[in-house]
Curated annotation (Swiss-Prot):
PANTHER family: REDOX-SENSING TRANSCRIPTIONAL REPRESSOR REX, REDOX-SENSING TRANSCRIPTIONAL REPRESSOR REX 1. NAD(+) binds at residues 90-95. This is Redox-sensing transcriptional repressor Rex. It comes from Bacillus cereus (strain ZK / E33L). Belongs to the transcriptional regulatory Rex family. The lineage of its organism: Bacteria, Bacillati, Bacillota, Bacilli, Bacillales. Residues 16-55 bind DNA.
Length: 209
């Protein structure tokens, strides 16, 4: 993505827009309004127009947005022509699910290797992805791998993150409950499924539709 000073909330919505625009293009649709986008991605149209305004004139009043132009724009903005190579650390139930999934709908993101300590898993392939011993982490991680998915037990998450900090990894998607401390040059996104579920239940009880 281009280094533009846009709000982080906007940046998080860009892949959502891109996915829907891809589907529109595949269906043969030539143009789309902000209202149609709003209905599809469940983001209000005013927010969509504001998000798009950070990138200049992407559409025309009374016409909407040209689908092919948007597709090309977001493809370039999100660096979809560059392959993002990913390593996964922790081949438990969640990690195994990731290996089988391997971002099949996102052709530019690929898990290329996994790490674990289980003798039953080390030396095997899961979903076509080789599983190495965690002791080989620094040796195996090449300069091409800049993103890691962390699905290890929370008790070892920080120590693994410390080791990743000594490699070329610049981004960690953390699925453990641990809140990690790393250097400023590494960006971490925390996804705690238990917290997400608790939040959903709270909203269901306190903000009924």
């Amino acid at each position: 993505m281009e280094q533009q000073k846009i709000p982080q909330a906007t940046a998080k919505r860009l892949p959502l827009y891109y996915r829907f625009i891809q589907n529109l293009s595949l269906s043969g649709k030539q143009r789309v309004s902000s209202a149609e986008l709003s209905e599809a991605v469940k983001v209000d149209s005013a927010t969509i127009r504001r998000d798009f305004s950070y990138f200049g004139a992407l559409g025309k009043k009374g016409y909407g947005y040209n689908v092919n132009y948007l597709l090309s724009f977001f493809r370039e903005t999100l660096d979809q022509d560059d392959i993002t190579r990913v390593a996964l650390i922790g081949v438990g139930n969640l990690g195994t699910a990731f290996l089988h999934y391997n971002f099949t709908k996102n052709n530019n993101t690929k898990i290329e290797m996994a790490f674990d300590v289980s003798e039953e898993k080390v030396g095997t392939e899961i979903g076509g992805i080789p599983v190495y011993h965690l002791d080989e982490l620094e040796e195996r991680l090449s300069s091409d791998i800049q993103v890691a998915i962390l699905t290890v037990p929370a008790t070892v998450a920080q120590s693994v993150a410390d080791r990743l900090a000594e490699t070329n990894v610049h981004g960690i998607l953390n699925f453990t409950p641990a809140r990690l401390n790393v250097s400023e040059n590494i960006r971490i996104h925390h996804i705690d499924l238990a917290v997400e579920l608790q939040t959903l239940v709270y909203f269901l009880k306190n903000y009924p539709q």
